[in-house]
Amino acid sequence: MQNLLEALVSRSLVHDQTPGLQARLAQGPITGYVGFDPTADSLHVGHLLAVMSLAWLQRCGGTPIIVVGGGTGMVGDPSGKRSERPVLSVEEIDRNVAAIRAQLERFVSFEGQNAARVRNNADWLRAIGLMEFLRDVGKHFTVNYMLAKDSVKGRMESGISFTEFSYQLIQAYDFWHLFRSEKCELQMGGSDQWGNITAGAELVSRKDGASVHGLTFPLLTTASGTKFGKTEGGAVWLDPARTSPYKFFQFWLNTDDRDVERLLKFFTFLSVEDIAALLAEQARDPGKRPAQRRLAEDVTARVHGPDVTRSVIEASRILFGGTDLRAASADVLDVLAGEIPSAAVTGDELAALTIADLLVKVGLAASKGEVRRGVAGRGFSLNGAVLESGDAKVAAGDLLAGGYALLQKGKRNYALVKVR
């Protein structure tokens, strides 16, 4: 079985590690955890490095623990933050915890000998009293030690509340609790979590005299210098209600050539050799972008499932060529309807409207005059066939699966009409 550290290092997924981790892994599988902040009801692609680290841990024989911060989410981690975030209510956090758990179940197995476990740190943090916490945790840390953490130093000028200042102690308590209750010996996280992770290892050492370990992965930026996972429309979410599967697929498909090797290593389970073969294929014919296509297909299938991914791929082919419209299923056209301008009409309305009327209705033309000029220049089409007249009507036999008709202006402007 592959060694966890070797697997992660081979994919450039390790930024830092505590001394002795390699020796501990050589002794056998390990139980490790990653914490997730429940301030939203969905994970986004910025969380996927953490998710993949848990998946690799399980593949290498270890037991992953997913700690959803129902307790720490009420405090707020200052790491990488310029200002204090609003504190969520218990009810909001509990709803978000349930949603995040459902998403994480797509990445790790909750069955078998090393089944993944989900823990909400509210279960133990809400049960500990202030006096007990100060006695059992606070006495092991000096203020100087806490002030030296980067997450605190970066906020000294702008101000940091005692609530956020104490966050590192609360996360340290998480690590100690999991070590005691579940023999968890490894915490993983982004490089901005290093201070919190080492605080936990320090607490375990002081209270129990035991060695536990930490591993961080790199904070990911793109070759253009922007933060990974951010688009003009904001974050790219795993929840299809927040980011549609089509837009999710396109996000990965549009990966810069300079980033694609790294993202294939980070976010797929393809072997390093298979990734090298993909890149060699891409070098021979860059226009086909096989590396980006494999990346988009792999990640979208894992997040949204293979059936949705196939529909998304077919919908993409409709817009960018390479598919027979008549063969497109209603599911594929439903996906497309969520991404391009669409209008719904009744059967009676369809019988009364000309194609020119429909083009105006969906916004592909401002007027019937524009349609006449466009038709003269062969600039409009219906279901892939160039329009000869805007005065014609869409017959029932012209409709695609699901009662759709696809209108097109030029090469890149599309709209759908659906008959109800």
From Swiss-Prot:
GO CC terms in record: cytosol
Swiss-Prot/TrEMBL GO biological process terms: tyrosyl-tRNA aminoacylation
SUPFAM superfamilies according to UniProt: Alpha-L RNA-binding motif (SSF55174), Nucleotidylyl transferase (SSF52374)
Disulfide bonds: none
Sequence motif 'HIGH' region, location on chain: 38-47
Subcellular location(s) per record: Cytoplasm
UniProt keyword terms in alphabetical order: Aminoacyl-tRNA synthetase, ATP-binding, Cytoplasm, Ligase, Nucleotide-binding, Protein biosynthesis, RNA-binding
Record PROSITE patterns: AA_TRNA_LIGASE_I, S4
Reaction(s) catalysed by this chain's protein: tRNA(Tyr) + L-tyrosine + ATP = L-tyrosyl-tRNA(Tyr) + AMP + diphosphate + H(+)
GO terms assigned for molecular function: ATP binding; RNA binding; tyrosine-tRNA ligase activity
Domain S4 RNA-binding span(s) in chain numbering: 353-419
Positions annotated to bind L-tyrosine: 33, 167, 171
Chain sites annotated for binding ATP: 230
UniProt short sequence motif 'KMSKS' region, positions renumbered to this chain: 227-231
Enzyme Commission identifier(s): 6.1.1.1
NCBIfam families in the cross-refs: tyrS
Chain's role: Catalyzes the attachment of tyrosine to tRNA(Tyr) in a two-step reaction: tyrosine is first activated by ATP to form Tyr-AMP and then transferred to the acceptor end of tRNA(Tyr).
HAMAP family the UniProt entry points to: Tyr_tRNA_synth_type1
The protein's assembly and partners: Homodimer.
Family as reported in the entry's similarity comment: Belongs to the class-I aminoacyl-tRNA synthetase family. TyrS type 1 subfamily.
Name the UniProt record assigns to this protein: Tyrosine--tRNA ligase
Lineage: Bacteria, Pseudomonadati, Myxococcota, Myxococcia, Myxococcales
